[in-house]
Every structure is written in C-alpha cells, then in structure tokens.
Amino acid sequence: KPGVFSIAAKATDSADIIATTEVKTDFRLMEAAPDLSTEMDSDGDGVSDADEGYDDSDNDGIVDYMDNIVESNLAPISEDSNRLLQSPEGTQLVLGEMAFANAKNSVLVSREKVIQIISELQLQLSESIDDKDYIYPLGLYDFTISGAIPSQSYYLVIPLPTAIEEGQVFRKYMGSKIGWQNFIENANNTLFSAKAIDEACPEPASRLYDYG
C-alpha cells in the first residue's frame, strides 16, 4: 500500500563502555515512480531530471531531481519561496517526518496539514501533537539537525515571512511524552532576531542579531 514509512536500526557495542547508536529514516512507497525527462530540469540546477534521478544523495529527505541545494546545512523553507533554513557548517538539516510526508520538499507545514497527515497515516492525534490552544500564523517548521558537537550550543536561522509581533512566542515540539512547550531561554538557549537584508537573513552568529 502506498504511503510514508519509517525504518530504524540500532547498534550496540558491548565493550567495557557500552555505546549505542540508533538511526532512523523515512521513505515513501509509491504505486509508480514519475517519469523523469531528459528535457525537464525541475530544480533549475542545469542538470536534467533523468540525469539526477530519484536518489537522495545528501540524505536530506529531498530527491535529487527536486533538490538544487548542495550545502547540507541549508534547507528550503517552502517550495514557493527562496528563503532557506540555515545551520552552522558541518551540521546537516533533514526534513522532519511531517514535512517529508507533506511531499513539498520543504520544512514548512501547516497545522491543518499535520492533522491531515496523521489521519492519512492512521496515527492517533494525541494532545501532545495537536497544540490547539495556539495558532501558528507563520506555520510549523519540521526538521532535524545533526552533526553538532554534543553539549555545545549552535546557531539556527529561520527566515520568517513577516516581522515578529508583540506577544508572539516560539514553541517547540519535545516529543510525545512532553509535547509542545515554549522555547526555554537560559545561558545556553537564546532567541535572537534581525531584519532581512535583500530578503536574506544574516549569517548564523552575525553581530546584526539582537536579543529577542
């Protein structure tokens, strides 16, 4: 049956110090793959769809013929925008489970679409997922980031379509056991903002960012 599925692998080293690593990936099962033409260049990178194929060479959740971003620390916000999610060099951004199921090759997904996807995948819509006491006028950004040094902080830039209004808060989904909660600011976690320059956000850690 066509749909979105996940596969996970767990490896444990039984040496003196037990270490465990677990990886998970999502994949889409289709009745038939779309025909790729040598005359079509869907992502506009100068290479035909047929030549790029269905692979996901950089493992970011976007097939090669639809992916014109080489840098692993960049991810498209939406398919109709040039705005890019950005993390530090050396890290990797990957579409989250809901963004991957949304099949738009970008990290932005609406709350309504999340509910629809959960229904289509026959998952239970728990209170932890449906943050119904809040509205999300700027949408939900679903992604994972890897490659950062453990216990160290790193910068993540999320370009927004409009300025942040007074009273708006940044919330983060912490998994099914915790659910949604406001982003906790402390010595290691801080929110910054800056005006876009030529519709582009300053680089991560730029001095152009101010607190809040």
Q: Where are the predicted features?
A:
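Extracellular calcium-associated, cysteine-rich motifs in secreted modular proteins
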Residues: 26-89
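Surface-exposed, short loops/turns at beta-strand junctions within beta-sandwich domains
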Residues: 2-3
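Predominantly extracellular/luminal regions of secreted and cell-surface proteins
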Residues: 78-120
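Hydrophobic/tyrosine-rich beta-strand signature of extracellular beta-sandwich/beta-rich modules
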Residues: 7-9
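An exposed acidic His-Trp-rich patch
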Residues: 168-212
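Extracellular fibronectin type III
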Residues: 19-23
